[in-house]
Regions:
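Charged docking surfaces used in two-component/phosphorelay signaling
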Residues: 9, 69, 158-333
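N-terminal Rossmann-like NAD(P) cofactor-binding subdomain of oxidoreductases
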Residues: 1-191, 227-228, 292-293, 297-303, ...
Length: 333
């Protein structure tokens, strides 16, 4: 089997470290693994498989000879290095939002639109984590009858805001238990024992940038240019795994039983739907998992062809690192 030279840009962050883990778990054919980061992190050492790898400084020259570069860095870093990566001949699988809506860049969820990988011109974008979790959960419905609209409410874990999110949550819980004052730094308000109904800045007509991603990215991934989505994104005091409540309206009626059958057979999904026995998806159960758990499937009482669905997925794994490695697997298939 052919082996590939792989680099991870932003290797020392949470997603970069998870990419290392997933590459090993999936036995990706790596001949060389290069870990790239800022000057602050360069020179450090990270374990991978049975050896230690020294973190290198991210610079244009670092991509020479690479076959695949997995991006786990912020938008500005992705934009800064993308030209050098493409010039080097490597394919850049980027987890940032920098290129997602570029018409020349495929936006890929392997369970949904794997064929779009072939359209790349050197860059393939990884979708937003909430988009991935939501669309994997409902793609089987779209294959049965086209989805016309979605109303979504997301319950997003603090780790989605970076490594500082869980630390701030734990520190606040401890401080409040001791009767101490807290000063939020990562989030705009106290997150312990609270929910914050804003993720991202205002983008369009009262919607935030995070909320518009599900519509904009969903249209591109599912090839549904007329898809309408109304979304509210909420930060909740959960450490890991995002949850999403979805009202999905399809062109033709899909029964609850048919929906359960479709989702149970769908790649990337696990049906957990037994209300009588209190079995349904929860963040605790999906953390450190690659599958999206789907349940609470029931008719929407406000529309003819609507279904209510609840899903949970690990935003660091399937929502980021695993999806990127799956794209890399498609590239070498």
């Amino acid at each position: 089997m052919k082996q590939y030279k792989v680099a991870i840009l932003g290797a020392t962050g949470a997603v970069g470290r998870e990419m290392m883990k997933v590459l090993a778990e999936r036995d990706f054919p790596v001949s060389e693994l290069h870990l790239l980061a800022s000057a602050r992190s360069a020179g450090g050492v990270l374990p991978w498989k049975e050896r230690d790898i020294t973190v290198e400084l991210a610079c244009d020259e670092a991509f020479a000879g690479m076959d695949i570069v997995l991006g786990a860095a912020e938008n500005d870093v992705a934009k800064r290095f993308a030209p050098a990566i493409v010039r080097s001949g490597a394919v850049f699988v980027d987890n940032s939002s920098a290129f997602r809506m570029d018409p020349d860049v495929p936006l890929v969820v392997p369970e949904i639109n794997p064929e779009d990988v072939k359209k790349h011109k050197g860059i393939i974008a990884n979708p937003n984590c909430t988009t991935i979790v939501s669309l994997v959960a409902i793609n089987a419905l779209n294959q049965d009858s086209p989805i016309e609209s979605i109303v979504a409410s997301s319950y997003q874990a603090v780790s989605g805001a970076g490594a500082g999110g869980p630390i701030e949550l734990m520190n606040e819980v401890e401080a409040l238990g001791l009767g101490q004052q807290i000063e939020p730094k990562v989030f705009q308000y106290q997150i312990a024992y609270n929910v914050i109904p804003q993720i991202g800045g205002e983008a369009f007509d009262g919607y935030t940038s995070e909320e518009m991603k599900l519509q904009n990215e969903g249209r591109k991934i599912m090839h549904l240019p007329e898809l309408k989505v109304s979304c509210t994104c909420v930060r909740v005091p959960v450490v890991r795994s995002h949850s999403v409540s979805l009202v999905v309206r399809t062109r033709e009626k899909i029964s609850v039983e048919r929906a359960r059958q479709l989702i149970a057979a769908a790649p990337g999904c696990r049906l957990v739907d037994d209300l009588a026995n209190k079995r349904y998806p929860m963040p605790l159960d999906t953390s450190d998992q690659d599958l999206v758990f789907v349940g609470r499937i029931r008719d929407d009482l406000t529309s003819e062809n609507g279904l209510n669905i609840w899903c949970c997925g690990d935003q660091v794994r399937k929502g980021a690192a695993t999806n990127a490695v799956q794209i890399a697997q498609l590239l070498v298939k």
